Structure formats: C-alpha cells, structure tokens
C-alpha cells in the first residue's frame, strides 16, 4: 500500500512539473507582429539574437527618443542586435493613421529599425507580447518608450522606463554583454 501511495504521489508531482515547465518555456521569439507596412513578422526569425523591444508613440514628450533608438540601431547595425518599436496609442499619444506614424518615424527621425503597426500594450486589449511579458516577468509599460531587452534565448534580461534614454550606459552595457 505504501508503495502505491509513493507511486501516485510521484506521478502527480511529475504531471504538475511537466505542466509548469511547459507554461514557462515561452520566449519573445514565440510571438509575431504586423509591421508598419502591414507585413507579418514572425519573431522566431530573430532567434539567437538579442532584441530590444520599445513601445513608442509619435505625440509624446519622449518621442525624440526615436533619434536615440536610431543612433543605437546604427551603432549596433553590424552586430546581432534587433530593435523593434511597437507603436501604441495605449497612452493616447499616437496617431491613428499608419501613414502619419510613418511620416514621424521616417521623415523626422530616419528610423531604419523595425516598427510595428499600432498595438495596445496594456490591459485586456494588450498585444500577446505585452501580456506575456506581464505574465512571465510582472513587467508592463507604465508609459511610452519603455524598453525591454531580451537575450539570445528570448528571455527578458532587463527593462527600463521612459526616463532612461536609449544611449544610457545602463542599456548599452547590457547590450554589449549580449552581443
């Protein structure tokens, strides 16, 4: 009887640990986005590369950070670093038209990194990427230009608020360790 009990307990523990492990194996690379031109981007194409994800808006006091992101993109262009800006009106500071957003990104800041079409980054309407970040890491953008850095395995390394500029040593030192 004791042997049967032990086997049952062991079986339940194994079942529980398998379910838990499966739930935590997700990475940033298990997601996809629609870019500013309407093309689907499967983030799995960036597997093995560090990725900086930034929620952005065109009518925000932090919008000039596009310039800093572009400088970062240019500086790290020959490395594996991928930069993705997810445009969002979650804080009521983004245009509704992708054409207007493109004009700001391209004409004003010469953005060359990947930019998504507008998505939600908070609440029930949040894009699955941001729901995943919140669920797995208890992190979510509190404002525009929150930055999330993922390692080559697609796991979150660090995140920074809008107040941290893209050129900050806090960010570049972490990137340098990943590339």
Where are these regions (language model features)?
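Positively charged n-region of N-terminal signal peptides that target proteins for export
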Residues: 1-6
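Conserved helix-turn-beta segment immediately C-terminal to the redox Cys motif
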Residues: 49-50, 59, 64-87, 106-109
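Thiol-/selenol-based redox modules, centered on thioredoxin-like
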Residues: 131, 135-179
